[in-house]
């Protein structure tokens, strides 16, 4: 993955965060100042007041009020007599999402402005910016830091490009030199974050919005968008779109305006909010205005702003099955519902895609993981799977009847680990397998035994961190029936 793969950026109405992109491509410090101008420093009270008046919420998915985060950090600093840390979450671990990478790559100074505002207002010890190790945006950010002076020491930390690496607790752990996975228990970063200090952690777009608001002031900022959710929203439109793009649009913009701009073929459904989001129908999409409340009215979620039309020419159940398999492989492996429950869910959804009558198995597997994980990963994965079966009920029925939907899986829902990226997958020689079951004992997060006692596992490429377990399973097979193959090399 390289910076050249960042999709085009466009806007509906007057751009704010993306202003100057068309003229300059990437905004260095001089271009940034020409486009956006300067801003005045804020006190902690002014920072909270500004965030409150513009109803600023986190743009990483959860939508938590930014002012409440700031208050919590200030209270914790006073209580513990410690300085705070400012953390910018620019990891963007979801494969379909590009909005933060687009800003990191083309407008990094706006992110740094927002972080600098918060750091100066709170008299922070340090600013830490977390980015994925895929290389997208990191060089641009480093160049931007070299051009300017920050109010306190500022460093960039890279984390593995995994789905769960961007979870707040996982990012804090990674910065602290621990495993880049969510903590097994609830920990408030505002109390105990980076280096044990109170930590203000928010998403890259959130800090960019803060920088825009500091320049415009609350009245002008609120002049665009909905009264209850003012300002613009950064969206990623991908999937079955002829012109996929990162789009900046005012809240309240009709969803169809955004989709039509990108040439979207919705087909039977649209995924909103990413791989922990939900599917909505094409008819529902016609009624939605871009906002958290707008998506909630049709049972969806804005999340981190991902809009993925499935299209009319791909198999939605097969696409969904691949994503659930991927999400199962992204487990941190630290709780049973995630480590064992998600592979069960993935197998059940895969069986549905292959024509098996496994709907009840999907519901049962989803029910067993819901609300029981150490983080939100099991809940989000089960929500994605169940909504797919609901929205694509006609396709599910066609598969169950043995006829199939007549459409192929085309990779409309992107995955980071494919044959093209060098990922390997397991293969079974059925002529050799005697059903000993040893493989499932050493790698239960990958392999389970079917009702006949034979190994069953996803047919998608394995993420690198599961290869070791797969290799152990291969080595213990007494019949030499199990192999790790490279699909790109013709299965060798």
Walk through the language-model features, giving the residues of each:
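Histidine-anchored nucleotide/phosphate-binding helix
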Residues: 107-121
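Cofactor-/ligand-binding subdomain signature composed of acidic, glycine-rich
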Residues: 2-48
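Gly-rich Lys/Arg/Thr-decorated short loops/hinges at beta-loop-alpha junctions or inter-strand turns
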Residues: 28-33, 88-100, 191-192, 236-241
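Hydrophobic alpha-helical positions that pack around
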Residues: 82, 133-251, 262-264
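Iron-sulfur cluster-binding cysteine motifs and their immediate structural context
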Residues: 337-343, 379-380, 434, 438-454, ...
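Conserved phosphate/anionic-ligand binding catalytic regions in large, soluble enzymes, centered on
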Residues: 52-73, 162-173, 328-338, 373-385
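C-terminal accessory/binding modules appended to enzymatic or scaffolding proteins
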Residues: 230-239, 249, 414-452, 460, ...
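Ferredoxin-type iron-sulfur electron-transfer modules in oxidoreductases and energy-metabolism complexes
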Residues: 35-46, 50, 82-84, 101-104, ...
């Amino acid at each position: 993955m390289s910076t050249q793969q960042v999709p085009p950026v466009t806007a509906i109405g007057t751009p704010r965060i993306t202003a100057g992109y068309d003229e300059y491509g990437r905004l260095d410090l001089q271009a940034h100042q020409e486009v956006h101008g300067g801003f005045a420093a804020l006190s902690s009270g002014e920072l909270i007041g500004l965030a409150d008046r513009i109803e600023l919420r986190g743009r990483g998915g959860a939508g938590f009020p930014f002012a409440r985060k700031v208050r919590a950090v200030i209270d914790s600093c006073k209580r513990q007599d410690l300085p705070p840390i400012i953390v910018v979450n620019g990891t963007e671990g979801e494969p379909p999402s590009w909005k933060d990478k687009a800003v990191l790559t083309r407008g990094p100074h706006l992110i740094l402005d927002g972080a600098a505002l918060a750091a100066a207002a709170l008299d922070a010890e340090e600013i830490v910016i977390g980015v994925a190790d895929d290389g997208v945006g990191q060089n641009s950010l480093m160049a931007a830091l070299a051009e300017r002076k920050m109010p306190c020491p500022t460093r960039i930390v890279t984390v593995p490009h995994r789905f769960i690496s961007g979870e707040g607790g996982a990012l804090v752990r990674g910065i602290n030199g621990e495993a880049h996975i969510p903590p097994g228990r609830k920990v408030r970063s505002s109390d105990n974050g980076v280096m044990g200090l109170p930590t203000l952690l928010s998403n890259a777009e959130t800090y960019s919005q803060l920088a825009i608001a500091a320049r415009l002031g609350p009245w002008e900022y609120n002049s665009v968008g909905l009264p209850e959710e003012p300002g613009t929203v950064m969206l990623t439109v991908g999937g079955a779109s002829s012109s996929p793009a990162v789009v900046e649009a005012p809240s309240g913009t009709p969803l169809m305006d955004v989709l039509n701009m990108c040439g979207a073929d919705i087909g039977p459904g649209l995924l909103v909010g990413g791989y922990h989001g939900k599917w909505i129908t094409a008819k529902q999409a016609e009624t939605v205005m871009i906002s958290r409340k707008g998506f909630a009215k049709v049972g969806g979620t804005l999340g981190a702003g991902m809009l993925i039309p499935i299209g009319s020419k791909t198999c939605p159940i097969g696409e969904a099955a691949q994503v659930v398999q991927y999400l199962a492989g992204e487990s941190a492996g630290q709780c049973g519902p995630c480590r064992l429950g998600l592979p069960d869910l993935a197998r059940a959804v895969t069986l549905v895609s292959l024509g098996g009558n496994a709907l009840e198995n999907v519901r049962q597997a989803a029910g067993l993981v819901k609300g029981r994980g150490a983080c939100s990963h099991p809940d989000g994965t089960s929500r994605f799977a169940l909504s797919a079966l609901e929205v694509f009920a006609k396709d599910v029925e066609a598969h169950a009847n043995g006829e199939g939907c007549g459409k192929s899986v085309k990779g409309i829902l992107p995955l980071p680990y494919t044959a093209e990226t060098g990922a390997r997958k397991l293969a079974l020689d059925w002529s050799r397998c005697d059903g000993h079951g040893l493989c499932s004992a050493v790698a239960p997060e990958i392999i389970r035994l079917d009702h006949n006692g034979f190994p069953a596992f996803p047919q998608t490429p394995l993420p690198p961190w599961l290869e070791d377990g797969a290799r152990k399973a291969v080595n213990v097979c007494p019949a030499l029936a199990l192999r790790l193959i490279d699909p790109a090399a013709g299965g060798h």
